[in-house]
Amino acid sequence: MHEERKMKFKELEKILLKDGWFLIDIKGSHYQYKHKNKKGKITIPMHRDDLALKTANSILKQAGLK
């Protein structure tokens, strides 16, 4: 069976913060970030389990980091 690779919430958050994203809101288990120079906002789910790598890569793409 294929085991899905995962990324921890804190790892992904660290990458975003280093790029200049900052926390603007928390709605339940979803953390929202904005950037001073980039459009839009990024939402990261913080659930009990780690994020699927596919989800983490999608978030990084939205942030302009992939």
Residue ranges and their predicted role:
Residues 28:
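Cytochrome P450 catalytic-core helices
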